[in-house]
Amino acid sequence: MPRMRFKPLLVCVSLAVGAVNVVAIVQPSRIPRANRVIGLLEHKQPVFGVYWPSNPSGRGRAGAPPPPDVAPKPPAVLAREALAYHEADFYFSGALEGGMDRGYGPVSDFVKATVDALSQTRSRFLSASTPLIVKVPKIGADREKAASEISRALNLGVSGLMFVEVESADEVRAGLAAMRFKSRGGTRSADTGDAPAYWGMSDDRYKQKADLWPLNRDGELINWTIVESKEGLAHVREIAAVQGIGVLWPGAGTLRGVFSTTNAAGERVVDTAAWENAIQQVLAACKEFNVPCGFPATANDIEMRMKQGFSVFVMNWGDAGFKTIEIGRKTGGR
């Protein structure tokens, strides 16, 4: 597919690429940040973001009626909706987690529509441009395939990637290497796809800026890593110790299922004590290794989670998520 050409425009489109250590946080970059998330973390400020708006999948909850037939919104409309909301520090999507081929089209369409919208309203939105961060499929044993998928995602122009279902330190190291160009000691190929166009810079400039923070304190890519299994919890300290993770997350939703059983009536019962212990286990590893810790908060628990030490939050798109961000920003002095 031929590369698209856009007018030079600095768009802070983000994919989870990052590494956090004490030095990186204490010594911020000497240059203005394109990636707002990294800038906030460097100054130890709480970070709040939302899943970007998307069309319904067409699947209702178990036992619930199917969603009503509604004409899907075109990418341009979804992008304008996202950019009209100014309180988010990042936009997030999990569309690629279930498979690159299935999710690539909608993500690519949204990124392109975002760039188009920014270019049409440059003076209004440029200073508030917000990074895009996306999940990628589980790294797993096929490291070559994982590296290819990571490169493909980065070439969209995102600024951050989330590694899902992480269960070992080696898995993280392989993923982080795939986020860095070979010239930086990584395994990412020299191909940059459409990323330079989305970032509004030349190919050479993109390669200079698109490196992993905080391994490179001037890098603009950030990595998020999520632990969401008993195997991952067993190795969470080894995972947290890997240099290059920008934010470590407990997979709260998935872990709720991990610590659930089915009773005699066929109902799912959550062991809330074990679930909370798992969350605190990840948080303790974050604190031990000075890695920011993330959580998918709601209005009911964001103040508590902030007091516990979580500092990066992602909420669902919509009024409930916006209310949660309002509470979080007030609590965090932002």
Where are these regions (language model features)?
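Expand to "…catalyze enediolate/carbanion chemistry for C-C bond making/breaking, isomerization
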Residues: 25-334
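Bacterial N-terminal signal peptides that target proteins for export
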Residues: 1-10
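Bacterial N-terminal signal peptides
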Residues: 10-21
